[in-house]
Amino acid sequence: MNASTTRRRFGQFTLVATAAALLTPLNAGVANAAEASETPTSSPAAYINYLESTSEIGADQTLKDFKALDAIHQKRYLNYLNDPDVFEDLLEEAADGSAPPNTKSLSDTGKLSTTDSATSEGGDIVLEKETNATFIPDAPLKGQLGTQALSRGTWTSHYTVSQKIFGITVTKLKAEVNYYTTGRKVTRVNWANGQVRNFNAVVAISKGIPKAWLSGGTAYGQVTWEGSIVYKGFGIQLDKVHRVWANHNGYQGGYLRNV
């Protein structure tokens, strides 16, 4: 499902750029102290050096994709990274990914993935909200009638928000919850986790301690993202709650909201 967005300004916001991924504090080797005026997003050469210097998983692909852009699009890409208004728009769009109550969102194939997207900046930027799940089944029971919403076993449901600029995944944030269902109800929540991949060099994102719980037959997983814009002109702080929930019918919802 696609929806277009327009540029908006909000009086106050807390950053999570789509929704890409773990931005560890900027690599010490990325910025040369002798070049105090240069940041990893100040020029295509500086950004390429940043990607070549980081050990983050996926950096090689991002580097390849960025190099494939022509000079004009490389400059526009970096302008978007340095523009806080872009993150305002993305935050608004990433707020909610809930399904209608008790939607049977998963099947016995053991895996299902759905993706919604919204565009901004004339299609240059795409925000994707993805839901998916994986399944480890129990051995079939004799006489099982197959009337369950889900198969008996252990499920992991995910809610992921990603930002793409010119088709390049810049930041990806994922919340996930692992739980056990008898096929008719959730009986146990095992764990929750969050994953982050980020190649926006002006944003530092860290993960809080994940939380998992069972309430009213629904499994919940939650993680808090904390961080800041490290580019001197922004002064934006990050404080977002990323939550996902599921029941015996499968994935039921997720959101990315201000704390």
Which residues are covered by each model-predicted region?
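N-terminal propeptides/leader regions of secreted preproproteins
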Residues: 29-151
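Mature secreted bioactive peptide module from preproproteins
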Residues: 136-259
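Secretory targeting and sorting signals
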Residues: 1-35
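Residues at structural and domain junctions
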Residues: 19-20, 63, 161
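Short, intrinsically disordered low-complexity segments
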Residues: 6-8, 128, 151, 242
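Generic N-terminal initiation segments characterized by hydrophobic and/or small/turn-forming residues
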Residues: 12, 19-23, 103, 147, ...
